[in-house]
Amino acid sequence: MAAITYRETKDFTERELERLFLSVGWESGRYPEQLRRGMKNSGVVISAWDGEKLIGLVRGLDDGETVAFLHYLLVYPAYQGRHIGQELMERILEKYRHMLHIKIMPSDPKTVPFYERFGFVAGGNYTAMELNQMQ
């Protein structure tokens, strides 16, 4: 097996994104064209590769100076437990070290301890809200 490599890129095929997102059960994988366009419009995207296979990524949305929202940290199930998610987080946090705020909204409570290891804490009176328009 080849060593895992990491790239800062926003260029993915629709099929690469579809496979990755559906592998972790995320419904947004059913919208690969929108995912591809969304990645291009993101602030920072760091991806993990096994050879030419996309196996993980983390995406940040930001205003360039004050706040970044980390969105989409996902790793193929067969590659989980190999510290790939940790490496992706370390790399994106380094890219955003100058920001005043870095925020994340974990969608699964079981992942909260993972983010706490990087210094994230529950945000006081904040409540995550969503308007889901997937059909």
Model-derived regions, located:
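Conserved active-site alpha-helix within GNAT-family acetyltransferase domains
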Residues: 98, 102-131
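Conserved acyl-CoA
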Residues: 87-102
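Conserved beta-strand in the GNAT
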Residues: 47, 53-62, 69-74
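Short amphipathic alpha-helix that is part of the acyltransferase structural core
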Residues: 1-30, 126
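A short helix-loop-beta-strand connector motif used in the catalytic cores of GNAT acetyltransferases and
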Residues: 36-47, 101
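Short alpha-helical
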Residues: 12, 65, 109-110
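Conserved acetyl-CoA pyrophosphate-binding loop and the N-cap/start of the following alpha-helix
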Residues: 79-88
